[in-house]
Amino acid sequence: MRLPGMGKWLLPVVLALVVTGCGQPRELSEEQRTALEQRVQARWLALVDRDFGRVWEYSTPDYRRNFPKHLYIHKFSYAVKWELTGVKVLDYDARAAVASVAVRVMSEPTKFTSTASRAIGAVPVTIHEKWIFIDGEWWFSTNY
């Protein structure tokens, strides 16, 4: 079924949607990527140092408003120590302003409970994180 006059407005609407969708950057600029990598590294260095109060400061503003620091610092284990070995930005969703990041760490128990755990030692682990760009700053997202 064809509606009268549909062609007059349908084509401009479709073209406008295509142009607006293409207008957003699909990739991060080098400056944005560097800023994100620095934030991820700084957060992980705070984790390595077990400065969980400082780690909390990298959480989104909404998260920090709803989850107080004094409770946040108790959600971490002291049974594992980490060494940051790398950060890689994997993907960026411009519409959602969300970046996917792979963080590579060496993970090792602080106390070896068996001969096997002592023999294995530190293990390489890749942790996938989501970071959200809000008001000109990258924030760690606990919601993904």
Task: Please report, for each region that a protein language model flagged, where it lies by residue.
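Short solvent-exposed beta->alpha transition segments
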Residues: Q38, F52-A102, P109
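Short, low-complexity N-terminal intrinsically disordered segments enriched in polar/charged residues
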Residues: C22-D51, E57
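Low-complexity, intrinsically disordered short segments enriched for Gly/Pro and polybasic residues
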Residues: M1, A35, F67, L71-I73, ...
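Sec-dependent bacterial lipoprotein signal peptides
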Residues: M1-C22
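Exposed beta-sheet edge and beta->alpha loop/turn motif
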Residues: A96-Y144
